[in-house]
């Protein structure tokens, strides 16, 4: 059964979120990046995951809930904190960027 993992780009003015499929510890991109607040990343991610009917509802909800937590953290001041702090807060999400 496939597993899924979020990844994020921590940018100065945006947070970009994407999903990878994880098979045998190897990650393969499943979606492109969705940007917040430039676009409604959460709604776009939801629509993308729903279009992939082979992803279970449980997995979709889990990914969207975790994306919500990440967006809220970034929005509530996390964007001004070092990436290392975000990575410590969200160890299950691969985070990269320029801060």
From Swiss-Prot:
GO terms for cellular component: ribonucleoprotein complex; ribosome. Part of the 30S ribosomal subunit. This is Probable small ribosomal subunit protein cS23. It comes from the Bacteria. One of its GO terms (biological process) is translation. Belongs to the chloroplast-specific ribosomal protein cS23 family. Coiled coil: none annotated. Keywords: Ribonucleoprotein, Ribosomal protein.
